[in-house]
UniProtKB/Swiss-Prot annotation:
EC category name: transferase
Organism annotation: Enterococcus faecalis (strain ATCC 700802 / V583)
Gene of this entry: apt
Protein name as catalogued: Adenine phosphoribosyltransferase
Pfam families (UniProt xref): Pribosyltran
Keywords for this protein: Cytoplasm, Glycosyltransferase, Purine salvage, Transferase
Length: 170
């Protein structure tokens, strides 16, 4: 199965000159969604994962079924003010401005082996911040899994030294 058949490419969205890669068709097709999940699970099995972490919102869509299949928990990374209990936070730069991601202080225990899942690796800012959150709590990031990598944006360079798998490249 070619998962690219289930990615919609929308030109000039959200602004002119950008091609948005929409994973909605993949999620809407049970076979494609299951295949994407299986490929990430197969990657993760040998890593002895204790916890899956995913940044909002599409990291939840990718990470939750992976955690379920691996029989481990899932910890959500959210924007500031969205998690109800005590959190840690990391602020990172965007193209115009900055953003802050948070994680519950008790989401990861020291030494836990963590897989981070998200839909897209673009500039690398979100994944770098997510790694920092996990490591602040003593977690060990043993892998980062993405449905899509946008090669021209070189996000992989920001997380050099981490094991990365992407199912599709554009």
């Amino acid at each position: 199965m070619d998962l690219r058949d289930y990615i919609a490419s929308i030109p000039d969205y959200p602004e002119k000159g950008i091609v948005f890669r929409d994973i909605s068709p993949l999620m809407a097709n049970g076979d494609a969604y299951r295949e994407a999940t299986k490929q990430i699970v197969d990657y993760a099995k040998e890593k002895r994962i204790d916890m899956v972490v995913g940044p909002e919102a599409r990291g939840f869509i990718v990470g939750c079924p992976v955690a379920y299949e691996l029989g481990v928990g899932f910890a959500p990374v959210r924007k500031k003010g969205k998690l109800p209990r005590e959190t840690i936070e990391v602020t990172y730069d965007l193209e115009y401005g900055s953003d802050t991601l948070t994680l519950h202080k008790d989401a990861i225990t020291p030494g836990q082996r963590v897989l981070i899942c998200d839909d897209l690796l673009a500039t690398g800012g979100t994944i770098k911040a997510t790694i920092e959150l996990v490591e602040q709590l003593g977690g060990i990031v043993v892998g980062c899994a993405f449905l899509i990598e946008l090669m021209d944006l070189h996000g992989r360079d920001k997380i050099d030294g981490y094991d990365i798998v992407t199912l599709m490249e554009y």
